[in-house]
C-alpha cells in the first residue's frame, strides 16, 4: 500500500476506560436477554455473541432499545454489503501492506492433520465474516451516544432495503479457552496479546483459536511485528472510517442518544460508564478486523 507522508498521523488513540467492564455471557443470560442474543446472532448470521454485545447488555434497558432500533437495518442487503466491503478492504490493506507468510506447511510439520487445519480455517471464517458487523453496530452505539445524531434513513436505492441472505450459522458456539483455563505457554501468549494490543481481556477470536494453542502462538508471532507500524495504524484508520461512513447510509434511521439512554432507564453515571465501555470496544474492533484478516491469510497459504 502506498501510504501518504503523514500516514503515521492516521491513528486511532486508545480511549480512556476507567469503567469496570461487566459482560453478560450467553450462559448467564436470562430468558429475555437470551431471546435478544438469539435474534442478534440470527440477524448477523453468526454463532457467537461478541463481547462488545455482552458488555453493552449489562446496561439492559439501553441495550434492548438500541438493538430494537438498529435491527431493521441489520436485516438488510445494505448491511450485508457494507460489512462485506469492510472485510474485503481489510483483506486488501493487509495483503498490500505486509508480506504474510503461509503457515500451512509449518502446521503440517507440527503434526496438524488436514482436518484440523480445515477446522482452524472454518473458525477464522466465522470471525472474519462477523467482526465487521459487530464493528458497525458498535460504531452506531458509540456515535449515537456521543453526537446525539440520527443516522441513515434516506436510502435512495430500494435494493438497500432488501432482506439479507437468510443463510446463517448460529450453532454451535465456537469452543473457547477462557483466560482462567489457560496455562503455561498459552497463558503467556494471552498476556502478550493483551499487553501488545492494550486489551483489558482476551477477545472471543483469540480464545476460539486457542483451541489449538501451538497454532495461536505461531499465528500471533507472525502478526505481532505488524501492530505498531504506520501501515497497520493507517489501516485501522481506514477500517474505522468505513464503519463511520456506513452509518450515514443505514436504510432505516437509527438514533440512540444520551437523552434516549436516560429515557430508557439508565442513570447519568451508568450512561457515562457505557460511553467509556463502548468507546473502548469500538476502538478494539477496527484492529480485530485486521488481525483476523492476517490470521486468515496465513492459514490459506
From Swiss-Prot:
Its EC number is 3.8.1.9. Keywords: Hydrolase. One of its GO terms (molecular function) is (R)-2-haloacid dehalogenase activity. Coiled coil: none annotated. Pfam families: DehI (PF10778). It catalyses: an (R)-2-haloacid + H2O = a (2S)-2-hydroxycarboxylate + a halide anion + H(+). InterPro entries: 2-haloacid_dehalogenase_DehI, AhpD-like. Homotetramer. Catalyzes the hydrolytic dehalogenation of small (R)-2-haloalkanoic acids to yield the corresponding (S)-2-hydroxyalkanoic acids. Belongs to the HAD-like hydrolase superfamily. S-2-haloalkanoic acid dehalogenase family. This is (R)-2-haloacid dehalogenase. The gene is hadD.
